Design a protein with these regions (language model features):
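Glycine/small-residue-rich loop that forms an oxyanion/phosphate-binding "nest" at active or ligand-binding sites
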Residues: 46-71, 77-79
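N-terminal [4Fe-4S]-dependent radical SAM core
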Residues: 1-49, 62-64
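Conserved AdoMet/S-adenosylmethionine-binding subsite of the radical SAM
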Residues: 76-143
C-alpha cells in the first residue's frame, strides 16, 4: 500500500500563483532537508501521520474542490509523491505541487503544474537550486 507522511490537509482559498482566489485543498507533506532562513512552515519538518493514497483521497473528496495543491515541507523529499500526483490527476483533480527547486522535477506527471520556489541568496539555501529544472518547465508551470 502506497503511503505518505502527512502534516496536514486543509481547505482554503489559494493565495498564490495564477490560481489565486480558487478554493483549493492543500495536502502538506512532512519533511524538508532545507533550512531556509525565512521558512514559514518549520512545523512541517517533523511529525505527521502515515496515510494511504485512498485515505488522503477520501479527505480531499469531502472538500468538493477541483484544485489540489501538494506542498510541504518539501513534497519531493518523499519518494511516493510522484505516484501520488498521478493518482490525483487520475481522479480528475487540477493538481499543482509547490517545490523548493532542490529536487529533479523531470518525473512529475505532465498534467501537474509545478510551482518552483527558487531559493534566493537570502534563504541561505540558494546553492540547492537545480538549474536543470528550468529547461523542462512547461507553460503551465510557474516560478
Amino acid at each position: 500500500m502506497d503511503t505518505l507522511t502527512i502534516n496536514e490537509i486543509f481547505y482554503s482559498i489559494q493565495g498564490e500563483t495564477s490560481r489565486s482566489g480558487f478554493p483549493t485543498t492543500f495536502v502538506r507533506l512532512t519533511g524538508c532537508p532545507l533550512r531556509c532562513s525565512y521558512c514559514d512552515t518549520e512545523y512541517a519538518f517533523k511529525n505527521g501521520s502515515k496515510m494511504s493514497f485512498d485515505e488522503i483521497g477520501s479527505l480531499i473528496k469531502k472538500n468538493n474542490s477541483l484544485y489540489v495543491t501538494v506542498t510541504g515541507g518539501e513534497p519531493l523529499a518523499q519518494k511516493n509523491v510522484i505516484p501520488f500526483l498521478r493518482y490525483l490527476c487520475d481522479m480528475n483533480y487540477s493538481v499543482s505541487i509547490e517545490t523548493s527547486n532542490a529536487y529533479d522535477i523531470s518525473n512529475i506527471d505532465s498534467r501537474v503544474s509545478v510551482i518552483l520556489d527558487v531559493k534566493t541568496p537570502a534563504s541561505l539555501e540558494s546553492d540547492k537550486n537545480m538549474i536543470s529544472n528550468y529547461k523542462i518547465l512547461k507553460p503551465t508551470d510557474e516560478i
